[in-house]
């Protein structure tokens, strides 16, 4: 009996180990690859027909801009986004009291040329300056994410690299973190984050670190200038058969040897208009207000 009990126990252990190995193997087979996440993300937006029917888009809502570190001031106004056949525009207009106050932002890419308004006689806003210095953010059809019909992931020809780099939690949400490189390349490090359950695109981060060339006397190492632009997308809702974010936030922060600051644009989008044939008037008039 002891002999049978011993070998019965051994057999049970072997079967248990085999079951675990089989389960691990099955999990490996079902582990998602980058192309799977990409495909599921497109499915999360809507059907091919619904996406095609919304090639021309107008989106309106409210906007606020905040200086998060220095003045901590908040200004409110309106937001307008439009896209059509490789064109995209982001407009914000803010209520101001004085002629020299920050009155708004205009980021316009017509498929060839990127234009970003000056907010003073000779300067763009810090956020606008960063986007202008790295035009691939807009020209690569990354900026604005799924809000624009020209979103880079809807066209493989716009993508050079889409690489899975594991999982990461964003505000408590488990996401797939992807390294992204647009066609034509970039000197930025670009990460995209996709909800691990719904595969919705909820964040893009653009970072740039530069050696300042001066040595910190206390640490004996070179100073670095750090720049980071973050786009956050939230409050997804079904709009004309598409699942799109209705909250859109752009945060830009920088830290240099001389100073540091952080700015935030926040938009609540409430009115969506899609058309399969006619471009938004803002493109037909060829005048961007």
Can you say where each PLM-predicted feature lies in the sequence?
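N-terminal secretory signal peptides that target proteins for export/translocation
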Residues: 1-9
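Bacterial N-terminal signal peptides
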Residues: 10-22
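Signal peptide processing junction and immediate N-terminal pro/mature segment
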Residues: 24-26
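Flexible, processing/modification-adjacent segments and terminal tails
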Residues: 28-36, 43, 110-188, 212-227, ...
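N-terminal mature ectodomain segment of secretory-pathway/periplasmic proteins
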Residues: 29-30, 34-125, 158-166
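A short, sequence-level motif marking secondary-structure junctions
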Residues: 76-80, 113, 131-133, 236-237, ...
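Extended low-complexity acidic/polar segments
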Residues: 77-90, 94-96, 100-103, 252-256, ...
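Gly/Pro-enriched, hydrophobic low-complexity segments
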Residues: 167-286
